[in-house]
Structure formats: structure tokens, C-alpha cells
A protein has these predicted regions:
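A conserved hydrophobic helix/loop-capping motif in glycosyltransferases and polysaccharide synthases
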Residues: 62-89
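Hydrophobic targeting segments
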Residues: 60-65, 97, 111-115
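Short amphipathic alpha-helices and their capping/turn segments at secondary-structure boundaries
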Residues: 37-62
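Membrane-proximal basic amphipathic "stem/tether" segments
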Residues: 1-46
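Conserved catalytic core of nucleotide-sugar-dependent glycosyltransferases
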Residues: 157-161, 166-168, 175-251
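C-terminal catalytic/acceptor-binding lobe
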Residues: 37, 239-311
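Short, acidic, metal-binding catalytic loop of nucleotide-sugar glycosyltransferases
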Residues: 80-109
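Active-site-proximal specificity loops/subdomain of glycosyltransferases
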Residues: 77-78, 116-164
Length: 311
């Protein structure tokens, strides 16, 4: 920005305007910004004049998918939303992710999928392998060292440390639209380029965000949807390996998810939600993937039936 524009920028800022490059986001300060640390951090990240140079690799994506398809896991023989058998329900969700990965690869994204399988039965594991064979990228299946939801969470987070790439941590009951992976990569790279800082993307708005924990947000316009700033997410999210490594203290206790006596220590509130004190969080409106577990876990404005029927 030349000297004339700098002077004009200072004058216009008093009236609530900011001069920015056309392709950049322009966030305006809100009243009582000091009373909302999350919004204040978001505004300052986009308003910062001097950007910190970061050399992290954001051109490569690793996807970690946790699977566990067996009779022991299922409480019922069928899913209440789709009405199909649990194994069919989960395998179709896995297929939706594979379709989305292939769509991203068609758009020149460099991706590897690692499946962390927690004792799926032999028939289901064979079906998972068959699905993976249609992938247009590298993939592998890793048998988790210990059984249990918390152990697989801990293991796939630990896997990401020191890898220097984007990471998407996902589980087998998320239904993805074909554009999901490609759009999350594009949005992450675009924001990272503008603010020179890492972020976290939750693929859908948190199920509690309009009830128990409603709060104001910035809304950013993307190419195909809007993106809302968030301070809550599940353990399914998109970020960078350096975030996992730098803030490992917020990941270690995920091993207690599902633990009868210590499960509270592994909750999102006690673990990865603390990341939002340090990095920006976003979720797409409408969602690019949904937790297809129950009616209560669905985000608004998302027709999951159409996505389900198209697979």
C-alpha cells in the first residue's frame, strides 16, 4: 500500500471502512469487541498489516479415517435416520468420503488416506478394502494398537505430529457431499494465505450452536457457500499438523473418550475446543459433511437425504 492509500485508509477507518486488496476479506470491528475474545482474535487476524512468514506445507492433505464396523459397536441393528443396517449405513458414509476425495484429486489436490481400523469384522473390512480400491490417491489401512474410541482418537492425532501437511480427521459416520474435501482445502489455503496463520474447519455447524451455546460470529463469503466463525467442534475437523504438534496438550486426553471413569477428561470442551483460544475456527453454511448419527446431530439447511440417495 503506497503512502497516499495509507493516509486514505486511516481516514476511512474512522468511518468504519478499510482499504484492502480486492481478493481479501474485509472484516469490520464490532461494538464491545473487547468482550468477545473469539471475535476480537478473528478481526485482528484479518486486520493485521504485517503478516508473519510461515513455511508450513499446505499443498498436501492427509486424511485420517477412523472405522469400527462390527456387531459389538452397534446398539441397534439399523440407523434411525437412514433405516438401513448399521454396517450398510457406515459403509455408505465411507463411500461418500471416497467420492469426495476423488473429486478433490480431479481438482489437482494431493491427498493420502490412512484408515485407522478398530477391529471391524472380516466381512466389513473386506468391503472397506473394496471401496478403497476405487480411490485415485494413495491409501493404507492401519489396525489400531488398542481397541476403543479414545484409543483410536489418540492414535490418529499422534500420527499427525511432525508430518507438515494439512490434516482432516474424520470418522466413519460422517456423510460428505462430493465437493467437501476440495472446498475445505480451498478455503483453508485461501485464509491461510491471507492471514499467515493456521485455522480449524469443522465440516458442519455444531449441533448445539443454536441452542445451548448460541453466540455471535463473523460470516465470510466463499466461492460456493458462507463460512461462520466458531468456537465449538467435535473431534472431526480439518487443520494442519503443526497445530496438533504445537498444542498437543489439548489432544493427549482424547484417549479418555469412552472411558467409564474418565470420559469427562476426553470431552471436546476439555480437549480440542481449547484450540479456539489460539486459532480461528470456521464451519461452512450449508455444511459440506454431516454427522449422520441421529436427528439431533444434523445441522440446519442440509438435505442429507439427497446426498444419501445420490451415492
Amino acid at each position: 500500500m503506497n503512502d497516499v492509500l495509507k493516509i486514505l485508509d486511516r481516514l476511512l477507518k474512522k468511518k468504519g471502512y478499510v482499504i484492502k486488496k480486492h481478493s481479501e476479506y474485509n472484516l469490520l470491528p464490532l461494538q464491545n469487541l473487547q468482550n468477545n475474545p473469539s471475535l476480537k482474535m478473528t478481526y485482528e487476524a484479518f486486520d493485521k498489516k504485517e503478516k508473519t512468514a510461515i513455511s508450513d506445507n499446505v499443498s498436501r492433505l492427509n486424511i485420517c479415517l477412523r472405522t469400527c464396523i462390527n456387531k459389538k459397536r452397534a446398539r441397534h441393528n439399523y440407523n434411525e435416520l437412514t433405516g438401513v443396517a448399521i454396517d450398510e449405513h457406515l459403509l455408505k458414509c465411507v463411500r461418500s468420503l471416497i467420492i469426495s476425495i476423488n473429486e478433490a484429486v480431479k481438482n489437482n489436490k494431493v491427498i493420502k488416506l490412512t484408515v485407522f481400523d478398530d477391529r471391524s469384522d472380516s466381512v466389513s473390512l473386506e468391503k472397506i478394502n473394496s471401496l478403497l480400491n476405487i480411490l485415485k490417491c494413495d491409501w493404507e489401512i492401519v489396525k489400531t494398537e488398542s481397541t476403543g474410541q479414545g484409543n483410536s482418537l489418540y492414535e490418529h492425532f499422534n500420527f499427525a505430529r511432525e508430518k507438515n501437511s494439512l490434516f482432516y480427521f474424520c470418522e466413519d459416520d460422517y456423510l460428505h457431499i462430493p465437493e467437501a474435501i476440495n472446498e475445505m482445502v480451498d478455503f483453508y489455503q485461501g485464509v491461510y494465505k491471507e492471514i499467515s496463520a493456521h485455522l480449524l474447519i469443522h465440516p458442519q455447524e455444531h449441533e448445539l450452536i443454536y441452542s445451548q451455546i448460541n453466540y455471535p460470529s463473523y460470516i465470510l463469503e466463499g466461492q460456493n457457500r458462507r463460512w461462520r466463525t466458531i468456537s465449538h467442534a467435535t473431534h472431526t475437523f480439518f487443520t494442519h499438523s503443526s497445530v496438533v504438534d504445537k498444542y498437543w496438550e489439548y489432544f493427549g486426553n482424547t484417549k479418555y473418550v469412552g472411558h467409564k471413569q474418565k470420559r469427562h477428561l476426553g470431552s471436546e470442551k476439555q480437549t480440542t475446543d481449547k484450540l479456539f483460544n489460539h486459532i480461528l475456527g470456521f464451519s461452512p453454511i450449508p455444511a459440506v459433511a454431516v454427522h449422520l448419527q441421529s436427528k439431533d446431530s444434523l445441522p440446519p439447511f442440509f438435505n442429507w437425504e439427497n446426498t444419501w440417495n445420490d451415492i
